[in-house]
Amino acid sequence: SLSDKDKAAVKALWSKIGKSADAIGNDALSRMIVVYPQTKTYFSHWPSVTPGHPDIKAHGKKVMGGLAIAVSKINDLKAGLSNLSQQHAYKLRVDPANFKILNHCILVVISTMFPKNFTPQAHVSLNKFLSGVALALAQRYR
């Protein structure tokens, strides 16, 4: 679980990266689709899954908007992300293993875009936070 120190580190990092959330989301989602091509199946209704395509940009923005909600609900991720969990489980039917894949891509993008802010402590805290988000999103699958 997230310690107070982790929560503070996530909030501090988010305050620095939040303005670039759309670019982070686009790059992370584009990266996921290229590096893990099996994830393309969730986006087969799009005309293209080429990195940077407007649909990828729009969904990357949605993903990062969801993470912004998670940061604001950091003290109770399960309750804060309940609606998103329901949507991903029942409407979108996303395999929860893909949350971990996207989390990894988000970490990679943040580390390359914000190397000075992505300290080892920020990395640990953000990784724990993203793992908590993945668990909260997977809660409706049980």
Curated annotation (Swiss-Prot):
<comment type="function">
    <text>Involved in oxygen transport from gills to the various peripheral tissues.</text>
</comment>
<dbReference type="InterPro" id="IPR009050">
    <property type="entry name" value="Globin-like_sf"/>
</dbReference>
<keyword id="KW-0408">Iron</keyword>
<dbReference type="InterPro" id="IPR050056">
    <property type="entry name" value="Hemoglobin_oxygen_transport"/>
</dbReference>
<protein>
    <recommendedName>
        <fullName>Hemoglobin subunit alpha-1</fullName>
    </recommendedName>
</protein>
<dbReference type="GO" id="GO:0019825">
    <property type="term" value="F:oxygen binding"/>
</dbReference>
<dbReference type="GO" id="GO:0043177">
    <property type="term" value="F:organic acid binding"/>
</dbReference>
<feature type="domain" description="Globin">
    <location>
        <begin position="1"/>
        <end position="142"/>
    </location>
</feature>
<dbReference type="InterPro" id="IPR002338">
    <property type="entry name" value="Hemoglobin_a-typ"/>
</dbReference>
<comment type="similarity">
    <text>Belongs to the globin family.</text>
</comment>
<dbReference type="GO" id="GO:0020037">
    <property type="term" value="F:heme binding"/>
</dbReference>
<keyword id="KW-0007">Acetylation</keyword>
<dbReference type="Pfam" id="PF00042">
    <property type="entry name" value="Globin"/>
</dbReference>
<dbReference type="GO" id="GO:0004601">
    <property type="term" value="F:peroxidase activity"/>
</dbReference>
<keyword id="KW-0349">Heme</keyword>
<keyword id="KW-0479">Metal-binding</keyword>
<dbReference type="GO" id="GO:0042744">
    <property type="term" value="P:hydrogen peroxide catabolic process"/>
</dbReference>
<keyword id="KW-0561">Oxygen transport</keyword>
<dbReference type="GO" id="GO:0005506">
    <property type="term" value="F:iron ion binding"/>
</dbReference>
<dbReference type="GO" id="GO:0005344">
    <property type="term" value="F:oxygen carrier activity"/>
</dbReference>
<dbReference type="GO" id="GO:0005833">
    <property type="term" value="C:hemoglobin complex"/>
</dbReference>
<dbReference type="InterPro" id="IPR002339">
    <property type="entry name" value="Hemoglobin_pi"/>
</dbReference>
<dbReference type="GO" id="GO:0031720">
    <property type="term" value="F:haptoglobin binding"/>
</dbReference>
<keyword id="KW-0813">Transport</keyword>
<feature type="modified residue" description="N-acetylserine">
    <location>
        <position position="1"/>
    </location>
</feature>
<comment type="subunit">
    <text>Hb1 is a heterotetramer of two alpha-2 chains and two beta chains.</text>
</comment>
<feature type="binding site">
    <location>
        <position position="59"/>
    </location>
    <ligand>
        <name>O2</name>
    </ligand>
</feature>
<dbReference type="GO" id="GO:0072562">
    <property type="term" value="C:blood microparticle"/>
</dbReference>
<dbReference type="InterPro" id="IPR000971">
    <property type="entry name" value="Globin"/>
</dbReference>
<feature type="binding site" description="proximal binding residue">
    <location>
        <position position="88"/>
    </location>
    <ligand>
        <name>heme b</name>
    </ligand>
</feature>
<dbReference type="InterPro" id="IPR012292">
    <property type="entry name" value="Globin/Proto"/>
</dbReference>
<dbReference type="GO" id="GO:0031838">
    <property type="term" value="C:haptoglobin-hemoglobin complex"/>
</dbReference>
